[in-house]
Amino acid sequence: MKSLDSNLDKALGRLSGGLYVVTASQGEGSTFRQSAMVASWVSQASFSPPGITVAVAKVRAIESYMQVGEGFVVNILREDNYQKMFRHFLKRFAPGADRFADVDVVNNIANGGPVLSDSLAFLDCKVSSRLETPDHWIIYGIVENGSVSDLSCKTAVHHRKVANHY
């Protein structure tokens, strides 16, 4: 892989994005499992049907949940209250650990995964297609449902300084 020169690295790092927690669930009963990750590479990709893209690193556990036909939820974090969720879902979890322990979720409103009570909004999506890049999958999802909890709040924004890490 070609290394980035300093100016290019800094220029790419200036691409900003919102802060999100992507969640997904699979299975039922004894096979039920859930996963989550912090994301900032999320973008609206189509109007009709409404669709979004999410970049997911190939090494993320949640990537295996996000296959064509499967559901996921994008929880949009609030500018005034994102730190707790951001820190919680950035930490490493032991295999099999409950990523949602000590996190308030709203049950039975999204098919794709948990909706975080503290999120500004959520988008319930179904994977329509996937595009492979060298180190990420670009997941295109059709938005099937969504809601905003507080119209007066703004989305938390992530500003990077360089492009070689999140």
Feature locations, PLM:
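Basic, polyanion-binding surface patches
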Residues: 1-166
